[in-house]
Amino acid sequence: MIYVSLTTIPQRIKYLNKSIESLLKQSKKPDKIFINIPFKYQRFKEVVSDNEIPKFDDSIIEITRCEDCGPGTKLLGSLNKLKKDSLVILADDDNAYEDYMVEKFFHFYSIASNNAYSFYVHPLGNFGIGQGADGFAINTNHLNGIKNFYDTVVKDYKELFLYDDLWISYFLYFFKKNKILSLREHLKKGI
């Protein structure tokens, strides 16, 4: 299975269609796109009511109402729906993605599924930080324990709560021993 998972916030929900449309136009279609929307937000007074959520005609899109885990809701909101031996691609709600994103991630996942991939990886010390804004592809087998990590290490620390790319990468590198590799050289050029 290939999943794409993202979240949104009240201020950006009106822009969600652009991101979703780009995901539906992928050269390799994901099997499921999760849009994880908290019932209420820790950072905002506003809420997203059911009638504010855009309606999508495509059956691969699933809206998941969930608790607010900050930007990490893009992963944690649908975590219990992800099957083993699958690829989950984290995306942001305010980006339109190139039509080859899913295909490239799946290609590299098929070759070396023990790695995680992003089109841009920010170096920090000995490990890289995958970027959801550029797509962040992870083998679902390596997510066992990440919710507990979030609950015990991240949830109550504002410094981490807002930086999902950092704590997800930290978990993958230090707890699951995954390399997080950049696919920057594999961006299409001149097309």
Predicted regions located by residue number:
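Short loop->beta transition adjacent to catalytic acidic/histidine clusters or analogous donor-positioning motifs
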Residues: 2, 24-35, 59-61, 86
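Active-site-proximal specificity loops/subdomain of glycosyltransferases
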Residues: 36-86
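Short beta-strand-to-loop acidic/aromatic patch adjacent to the donor-nucleotide binding site
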Residues: 85-96
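C-terminal catalytic/acceptor-binding lobe
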Residues: 1, 14-19, 155-191
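N-proximal low-complexity "stem/linker" segments adjacent to membrane-targeting elements
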Residues: 1-25, 34
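Short, acidic, metal-binding catalytic loop of nucleotide-sugar glycosyltransferases
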Residues: 19-31, 39-40, 52-55
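Conserved nucleotide-sugar donor-binding
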Residues: 129-151
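Conserved donor-nucleotide/metal-binding helix-loop-beta segment in metal-dependent transferases, i.e.
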Residues: 99-124
